[in-house]
Amino acid sequence: GSLYLDDLKKLVDKTVCLIAFPHASNIIGQVNPVKAICSLAKEAGAFTCVDGVSYAPHGIPQINDFSPDIYLFSSYKTFGPHLGVMYVSDSLATELESQCHYFNQEFPNKRFTPAGPDHAQVAALGGIYDYYDSLSNHHLNSELSSSSCFDKLNNLISNQEKKLLKPLLDFLKTKKDIRLLGSYEIED
């Protein structure tokens, strides 16, 4: 459901080690204030783990902007292969115990892959980039090359979803026998 930053502030102190939360609710679709939660956690000395599985199909997660310690999503929900994707910040990765063979411990990209990568699945991840690059070429007349391009694509996707969602919400408002979890209003 909905996460409220003011409620979280009351719970976070120096004893909190990890704040794990969804980027977006899988139930009501509300996008949570990821950047603010990550900032609050850092102030308290806690790590963050953001579950992006419900958000990633609706936009490109701006991991550099949010600064989470861990960000996870399923690539099959973003036009990719059936594969889990995990980002781990360099600062956290150096603190975690290596899960690989001893001779790979010094390689950040190998530390958490004990059996080695599934090369076919990893190669198929390139299709996600191709999809977004095609969107960028078609709608923005530019190649996928910068964070501003990602921002424009996020806006493009979001605006299309809002356009499709508004008539549905307007219709549901007229139905007295339906209870909507979440808001009838489309938030930015």
Residue ranges and their predicted role:
Residues 1-188:
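Pyridoxal 5′-phosphate
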